[in-house]
């Protein structure tokens, strides 16, 4: 199932990532990178990327859309995450709902949904985050509190590569987030991990993968009921 389509994409080579949100290509294009993660395995000098032309108020007129993993193109544009997630939610779901000190991505009926995008994989395991995220931990804390108050809550993780068989929080990068993820599972927060593949200009939904229960049990002595 195609869930998103880009305009024409152009292949470039990374010359430098001059800050978190700006990439310079070997052809001297200056492109916006809409992903706050480290992306060290994807955005580095000499690697291939796909860009698209954009018009707007930014100083850049192109946007990094995907990067080559060595096996496939991995989408690196977090600006489209919620649009993709909405394809799996009721049409009347409300966006950007304020809860406590945070904004939760979606709400409908008695359900709250937070969306996270994942681009990192190691040994067949999808990992999030690839950089410490206090904001991500805060979102999990809000989901836990909502669950305790009787709401249905869902953490929807969008994985933009297919070389994965299960998902785990990235303990090596952010133990606080990872421990809170475990806590969320214990509290009854639902987790859906959806896998996508870039096929030419189209993002295609490939199905779901489970949370890596065996890895979590080994890392934290946590076992699911």
Curated annotation (Swiss-Prot):
Q: Name one GO molecular function term.
A: DNA binding
Source species, domain of life: Archaea
Q: To which protein family does this belong?
A: Belongs to the SfsA family.
Mind telling me which HAMAP family this protein's record contains?
A: SfsA
**Record-given protein name:** Sugar fermentation stimulation protein homolog
Gene source species: Sulfurisphaera tokodaii (strain DSM 16993 / JCM 10545 / NBRC 100140 / 7) (Sulfolobus tokodaii)
Give the gene that encodes this protein.
Answer: sfsA
């Amino acid at each position: 199932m195609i869930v998103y389509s880009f305009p024409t994409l152009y292949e470039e080579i990374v010359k430098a990532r001059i800050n978190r949100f700006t990439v310079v290509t070997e052809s001297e294009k200056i492109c916006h990178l809409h992903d706050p993660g480290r992306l060290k395995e994807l955005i580095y000098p000499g690697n291939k990327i796909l860009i698209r032309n954009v018009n707007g108020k930014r100083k850049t007129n192109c946007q990094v859309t995907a990067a080559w993993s060595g096996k496939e193109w991995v989408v690196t544009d977090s600006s489209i995450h919620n649009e993709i997630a909405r394809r799996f939610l009721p049409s009347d779901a409300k966006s950007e709902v304020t809860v406590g000190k945070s904004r939760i991505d979606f709400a409908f009926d008695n359900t709250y949904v937070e969306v996270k995008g994942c681009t990192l994989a190691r040994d067949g395991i999808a990992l999030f985050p690839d950089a410490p995220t206090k904001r991500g931990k805060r979102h999990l804390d809000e989901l836990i509190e909502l669950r305790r108050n009787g709401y249905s809550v869902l953490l929807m993780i969008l994985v933009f590569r297919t070389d994965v068989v299960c998902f785990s929080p990235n303990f090596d990068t952010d133990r606080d987030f990872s421990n809170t993820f475990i806590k969320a599972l214990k509290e009854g927060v639902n987790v859906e991990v959806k896998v996508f593949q870039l096929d030419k200009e189209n993002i295609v939904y490939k199905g779901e993968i489970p949370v890596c229960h065996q890895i979590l049990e080994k890392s934290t002595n946590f076992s699911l009921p």
